[in-house]
Amino acid sequence: MYAQAAIKPNTLLRNGAYGIVMRGVQKCTCAGASLRGRNSAPLCCINLDTATDPACGTAGFLVSASEYIRNKYEDTMTPEQWDHFGGEMFTGFDTDRTMLRISAMNLMLHSIGNPDVDYRDSVSKQNQIRGKYTVCLANPPFKGTVDAGSINDDLKAVTDTKKTELLFLALFLRMMKTGGRCACIVPDGVLFGSSKAHKSLRKELVENHQLRAVISMPSGVFKPYAGVSTAVLIFTKTGAGGTENVWFYDMKADGFSLDDKRSEIEENDIPDIIERFHNLERESTRQRTEQSFFVPKQEIADNNYDLSINKYKEVEYIPVEYPPTSEILADIERLNREIETEVQELKKLLEMGKSDL
């Protein structure tokens, strides 16, 4: 039933009402709204039971997750599973009613017949959800702050801050069941920030849960809307630790140019990232000079839980051999003689010109 409900969702999105709405949205500036990098979303799509995006925007991540499930399991899903797929499997929250309407339309056009998207300030005391979801896929607001009095006390216990990018990470941990998996996009500052709130949040992920991967992305992936450098954090909620080695990947290209035009290009690291992430046992021999490698938990702890790849990446410098000093000086003297000869010839030509006058 649901398999036939959206035969060509891409065509609908491109030419239908949703495409028109999205083109309009791209021109507006809704406070705190973040238009998702759709090309990055497949990194976050894993086998799902119940998924949430507490800052869903246009529901780009949830749609990508639904497409992943359709492509992989469509032929084997039971009617009960399709009912679950079209109903309670995907949940989103946002504080912008326009975005909620768009996200509902987006999900319905992708076979989610009863999208569960609600108006809710996810990091406020209003949100009391805990231990409910098995997967969290999110791109929370960057560089924002919220009123200190409205922040849920549970979140402040993990990271005492007003910064949304930190509060949402603490929120993901609270909203997921034990064993739940999260893939979220964060600004680079989360990885190396030196404040107490930054360090305590990173320590929470590394020491009390299982941080699996840090995928650094180039700064242009969100252009023309934002030029901030970002990364994908992938972790599992355990409440009992589990981090042994963290996998780092330095993404150079995502299939699109990194300027404001974001034109398609051949270079694309995303297929390589997905392949390597699903075969991490092969990564143990990778060197720090390569594009991806493991870093032991203890080394991360010794570096104040810094999660920036540049902290651990080794740059292989190729030595440059220069000629002897005597040879360089001889070349300089030769060039000076050539210049002097040319100057003298130029003077002669100028003198000849004067005599002709």
Residue locations for each model-derived region?
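Hydrophobic beta-strand core residues of beta-sandwich domains
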Residues: G24-V25, T29-C30, C45, M176
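Intrinsic disorder/low-complexity segments
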Residues: K8, Q26-K27, A31, G37, ...
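A conserved structural/catalytic subdomain of Rossmann-like adenosyl-cofactor enzymes
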Residues: S124-L357
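Long recognition/docking surfaces used for binding and targeting
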Residues: M1-Q26
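Conserved S-adenosyl-L-methionine
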Residues: A31-A138, K143-T145, D154, K162, ...
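Local alpha-helix boundary/kink/capping signal
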Residues: N15, R23, G60, V146-D147
